[in-house]
């Protein structure tokens, strides 16, 4: 029996990165990108209807950045894993994001294999559902 695929919402202002992450994650047997958003406002609008298991969230975005969106995403998706995926490599920023409710912080320079491995570590245990 094939395990349930983790539903992923990709939030980043760079359209090419959203598309790339969608393609890269969709080819994996255990992930399915269910939606994308270009900023925190769009992410909040889509969060409840898409009900993702994982939110891959950029920090630096126009309109509403990742840190601003984080509390609202956490409120709407209490069981989802929120992963900051950012080009910023500052330890203080990572600590701030984790303190604000993020489950993990991954730098954008990370290889695809490392990103997928980290997302697999965050998978929900069998039998536990976000609905």
Where are these regions (language model features)?
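Conserved acidic segment of CheY-like receiver
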Residues: 4-25
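Active-site T/S-Asp motif of two-component receiver
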Residues: 10, 57-58
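Acidic catalytic/metal-coordinating carboxylates
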Residues: 39-42, 65-68
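Active-site beta3 strand of CheY-like receiver
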Residues: 50-56
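Receiver (REC) domain active-site loop signature in two-component systems and cognate sites
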Residues: 61
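Alpha4 helix (beta4-alpha4-beta5 surface) of REC/receiver domains from two-component response regulators
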Residues: 68, 89-106, 110
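C-terminal output helix
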Residues: 92, 110-123
């Amino acid at each position: 029996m094939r395990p349930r695929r983790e539903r992923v919402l990709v939030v980043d202002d760079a359209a090419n990165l959203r598309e790339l992450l969608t393609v890269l994650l969709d080819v994996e047997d255990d992930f399915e990108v269910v939606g994308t958003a270009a900023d925190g406002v769009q992410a909040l609008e889509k969060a409840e209807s898409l009900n993702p298991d994982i939110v891959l969230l950029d920090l630096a975005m126009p309109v509403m950045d990742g840190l601003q969106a984080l509390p609202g995403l956490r409120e709407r998706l209490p069981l989802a894993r929120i992963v900051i995926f950012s080009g910023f490599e500052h330890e203080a920023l990572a600590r701030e994001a984790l303190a604000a409710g993020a489950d993990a912080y991954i730098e954008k320079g990370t290889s695809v294999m490392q990103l997928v491995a980290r997302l697999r570590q965050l998978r929900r245990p069998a039998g536990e559902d976000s609905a």
